[in-house]
UniProtKB/Swiss-Prot annotation:
<feature type="binding site">
    <location>
        <begin position="126"/>
        <end position="129"/>
    </location>
    <ligand>
        <name>NAD(+)</name>
    </ligand>
</feature>
<dbReference type="GO" id="GO:0019877">
    <property type="term" value="P:diaminopimelate biosynthetic process"/>
</dbReference>
<comment type="similarity">
    <text>Belongs to the DapB family.</text>
</comment>
<dbReference type="GO" id="GO:0016726">
    <property type="term" value="F:oxidoreductase activity, acting on CH or CH2 groups, NAD or NADP as acceptor"/>
</dbReference>
<feature type="binding site">
    <location>
        <begin position="102"/>
        <end position="104"/>
    </location>
    <ligand>
        <name>NAD(+)</name>
    </ligand>
</feature>
<feature type="active site" description="Proton donor/acceptor">
    <location>
        <position position="159"/>
    </location>
</feature>
<dbReference type="GO" id="GO:0050661">
    <property type="term" value="F:NADP binding"/>
</dbReference>
<comment type="pathway">
    <text>Amino-acid biosynthesis; L-lysine biosynthesis via DAP pathway; (S)-tetrahydrodipicolinate from L-aspartate: step 4/4.</text>
</comment>
<dbReference type="InterPro" id="IPR000846">
    <property type="entry name" value="DapB_N"/>
</dbReference>
<keyword id="KW-0028">Amino-acid biosynthesis</keyword>
<comment type="subunit">
    <text>Homotetramer.</text>
</comment>
<feature type="binding site">
    <location>
        <begin position="169"/>
        <end position="170"/>
    </location>
    <ligand>
        <name>(S)-2,3,4,5-tetrahydrodipicolinate</name>
    </ligand>
</feature>
<keyword id="KW-0220">Diaminopimelate biosynthesis</keyword>
<dbReference type="GO" id="GO:0005829">
    <property type="term" value="C:cytosol"/>
</dbReference>
<dbReference type="Pfam" id="PF05173">
    <property type="entry name" value="DapB_C"/>
</dbReference>
<keyword id="KW-0963">Cytoplasm</keyword>
<keyword id="KW-0521">NADP</keyword>
Length: 273
């Protein structure tokens, strides 16, 4: 596949993120919308994807059958639910299609299965497709190397009332970045809730706090607190378009890869920072 006019399929086309993805693909000079997908029983089947996204007709009817559009796309972008994502991934592997996965809430077993499928097809899997968030993850590694051994580390995240998983995938990615830089296992040092008489803070733990309210698109802060000073690294998203544009960028990049497991660090070439 070439890096011009990559044909993209958008899963979950009727959702908030799906509509943003349709808009982002339409704005891209390197990609076109090849297919838009929804549930088989959805009333949106047959509706023009562009009309649904509020940008005018694109000539692409929303479909409830992935098999019916398998020849219409090169890369699938999926921001849905874990079970649906696993089915999309299996289909893409069988039909040699690349897939960009922005779904969160996967189990550890599902994450391992995604890595296994990537041996046969191209996969970009990231908790967050914002350029700023992925740069923040690299900054957190640097901060952890300098302050992490002595500082109390807390991660605070806030999202809209409709988000169904907590902590967010991005918050967990932040924790993994920090723990990895410190040689720690996040599964052993994470503290996800505090209530009642908790006692003093456990040394070398990484705490998480979650807010769900209103229409907050996404806010994440990592705090490195020492006695007398603290460093806070924060990212705030004001529009889902930042995630959608990043996902389209990832899809265009993935079109040049035959197979393999990648994340936004690879897409943005942040390895050298």
């Amino acid at each position: 596949m070439s890096n011009t006019s990559i044909r993209i399929a958008v899963a979950g086309a009727g959702g908030r993120m799906g509509r943003q993805l349709i808009q982002a693909v339409a704005q891209s000079e390197q990609a076109t919308l090849g297919a838009a997908l929804t549930r088989t029983d959805s009333a949106l089947c047959g509706v023009d994807a562009g009309e649904l996204a509020g940008i005018g007709a694109l000539g692409v009817a929303i479909s409830g059958e992935l098999a019916a559009v398998k020849d219409d796309f090169d890369i699938l972008i999926d921001f849905t639910r874990p079970d649906a994502s696993m089915a999309y991934l299996a289909f893409c592997r069988r039909h040699h299609k690349g897939i960009v996965i922005g779904t969160t809430g996967f189990s550890d077993a599902q994450k391992e299965a995604i890595r296994a499928e990537a041996q046969e097809t191209g996969v970009v899997f990231a908790a967050n497709f914002s350029v700023g968030v992925n740069l923040m993850l690299k900054l957190l590694e640097k901060a952890a190397q300098v302050m992490g051994e002595e500082a109390d580390i807390e991660i605070i995240e806030a999202h809209h009332r409709h988000k169904v998983d907590a902590p967010s995938g991005t918050a967990l990615a932040m924790g993994e970045a920090i723990a990895g830089a410190l040689g720690r296992d996040l599964a052993r040092c994470a503290v996800y809730s505090r209530e009642g008489h908790t006692g003093e803070r456990k040394a070398k733990s990484i705490g998480f706090a979650t807010v769900r309210a209103g229409d907050i698109v996404g806010e994440h802060t990592a705090m490195f607190a020492e006695i007398g000073e603290r460093l806070e690294i924060t990212h705030k998203a004001s529009s889902r378009m930042t995630f959608a544009s990043g996902a389209v960028r990832a899809a265009v990049w993935l079109s040049g890869q035959k197979r393999g497991f990648f994340d936004m660090v690879n897409v943005l070439n942040l390895d050298k920072i």
